[in-house]
Amino acid sequence: MGGVFVVFEGGDGAGKTTQARLLDQWLTTEGIPHLMTREPGDSWLGQRIRELVLSPGSGPISSRAEALLYNADKAQHVDEVVIPALREGKVVVCDRYVDSTIAYQGAGRALDPGEVGQLACWATTGLVPDVTVLLDVDPCEGAGKIAAKDRLEAAGDEFHLRVRQHFLDLAAAHPQRYLVLNARKSRKEISEAIRQRVTGLLNR
């Protein structure tokens, strides 16, 4: 297909969005064609789904319904945004992807992560990132410091502990794809490690 698919994952407050933006800035400076995107919300359908699943004002959403909504966003996002950019040979920088759905809607909501993963694989036509950057942080230091919380950020300590552990389990199961970084390190240290990994993918 061409292109390079870079995904940022991690618990709330880990700094993944900050690092995704820093990578976006570096790619711009280097003149490398790229696209920065996010899930949920970077398609016309995803914008509406994002409002439903994250707004604290939304009514109760069952765990299975939530998983289906997130995967509907993924299906549209991959078809409309990600695959076209990769076919153009761009670096796609994505803030959250399949593993967030498995960790949050699977482990976090106490659904079967395997079933959620199968659904996500189908929704994304099996598209796997070239690298998944996991910024690991204790939930008490991440989600705990966010003042204005959305529905998932406000889900409670046990929820976020399950999410963190499942991210680490996924990283252990896919060591070649994952780059696990301690989110407590400096922004500079983290961004340099990410740039080094992405440079290697660009030069392969």
Curated annotation (Swiss-Prot):
GO terms for biological process: dTDP biosynthetic process; dTTP biosynthetic process; dUDP biosynthetic process. InterPro entries: P-loop_NTPase, Thymidylate_kin-like_dom, Thymidylate_kin_CS, Thymidylate_kinase. Keywords: ATP-binding, Kinase, Nucleotide biosynthesis, Nucleotide-binding, Transferase. It is an enzyme of class 2 (transferase). The keyword ATP-binding applies. PANTHER family: THYMIDYLATE KINASE, UMP-CMP KINASE 2, MITOCHONDRIAL. This is Thymidylate kinase.
